[in-house]
Amino acid sequence: MKKILSIFICFSLIGILSFTNSCKKDNKIKGCTDKDSYTYNSTAQEDDGSCLYQGAVVIWYDQAASTGLIADGATALTFYLSGEIVGSTATSVYWTAAPACGDNASITATEDLAKVKTHAYTLSVKDQTGYEYWTTVLNIDANTCLQFQLLWSARKK
């Protein structure tokens, strides 16, 4: 009888331990583990697909472009990224070197890239009459500032 009781207790303990271990929860902290994401979670141990990204571009031109635009009759420029206005400025305003994203009076656009780390946008620059001086495709990358210079080449309306 004592032997049967010992066997019963032994199997009961094995059953309880097996049940307890099978119900053990995964205690890993889930979140965004990519440092390029603005939703990065430094305490996350497992990526859960929640990473979201942003990238920026600053569009600028120098004195040569300003002089050419003014000589061509352009007094103001409007900047579009994929059809959306991101800024405007007088053609007499120019930079002697590339500005940083967000610099005062710069044409800076911060774009939501959603769950991708790079996205292509169409840049269009038009004057006050709607004449398009520049059009190109820009690839904006996550967690970066693209400094894009508009280069002047003689154009006639």
Regions from the PLM with identified roles:
Residues 56, 74-76, 118-122:
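Exposed beta-strand and adjacent loop surfaces of beta-rich binding modules
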Residues 84-108:
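Short, acidic Ser/Thr/Gly-rich low-complexity loop/linker segments typical of extracellular
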Residues 57-65:
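A short, amphipathic beta-strand motif
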Residues 124-157:
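Structured interaction patches on ligand/partner-binding surfaces of diverse proteins
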Residues 105-131:
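A short, solvent-exposed beta-strand micro-motif common in secreted/extracellular proteins
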Residues 46, 66-92:
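Short, ordered, surface-exposed loop/turn motifs in non-cytosolic proteins
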Residues 3, 15-57:
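Bacterial Sec-dependent N-terminal signal peptides
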Residues 1-9:
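Bacterial N-terminal signal peptides that target proteins for export
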